[in-house]
């Protein structure tokens, strides 16, 4: 929870917040409607709406601010079991891909400020590609382990360091 809040505060400080948690978001209604409102088929409504709102504000050269307020208190319901958690996380992953695909024209465009130059590229590399890279790394590691190419003393020290500090 601490890393989540610190991450949100960092994104807020640079006005590059990628999303807000569903039940915790407050939006300027007129901007949300002008940007197209909620997209019903979206799997990540909050990220999609924020990205569209930022796109709208930048297209019309209007100032905007996306702020995380860390001391808000609101109750929300989490997944009650592992099956529901799995469905929630796969829906979020599909939503991330969907949002990145829909708004790909914003990526690396100076017009879209932090969202185009930092937030969307970050989301692509560290949220979308990272699990794929990690899976490939695991497969390669298993292959190397079976072929005897792993120095186990070094491998255990690396894993211990990674999982202790990351």
Language-model features: where?
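Long helical/loop segments within the catalytic core of UDP-sugar-dependent glycosyltransferases
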Residues: 1-42, 55, 90-97, 101
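Basic/Trp-rich segment in TM-proximal cytosolic loops or flexible interdomain/linker regions
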Residues: 14-15, 79-166
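Catalytic core and acceptor-binding pocket of nucleotide-sugar-dependent glycosyltransferases
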Residues: 24, 45-48, 52-53, 121, ...
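A short, conserved alpha-helix in the catalytic core of glycosyltransferases
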Residues: 31-34, 42-67
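Active-site donor/metal-binding and catalytic loop motifs
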Residues: 64-84
């Amino acid at each position: 929870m601490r890393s989540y809040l610190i991450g949100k505060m960092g994104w807020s400080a640079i006005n590059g917040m990628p999303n807000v948690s569903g039940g915790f978001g407050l939006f300027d209604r007129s901007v949300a409607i002008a940007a197209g409102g909620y997209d019903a088929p979206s799997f990540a409504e909050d990220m999609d709406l924020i990205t569209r709102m930022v796109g709208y504000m930048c297209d019309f050269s209007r100032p905007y601010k996306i702020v995380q307020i860390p001391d808000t208190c609101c109750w929300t319901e989490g997944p009650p079991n592992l099956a529901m958690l799995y469905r929630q996380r796969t829906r979020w992953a599909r939503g991330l891909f969907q949002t990145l695909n829909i708004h790909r024209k914003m990526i690396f465009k100076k017009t879209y400020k932090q969202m185009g130059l930092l937030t969307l590229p970050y989301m692509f590399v560290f949220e979308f590609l990272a699990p794929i890279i990690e899976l490939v790394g695991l497969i390669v590691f298993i292959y190397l382990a079976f072929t005897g190419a792993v120095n186990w003393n070094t491998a255990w020290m690396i894993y211990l360091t990674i999982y202790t500090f990351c």
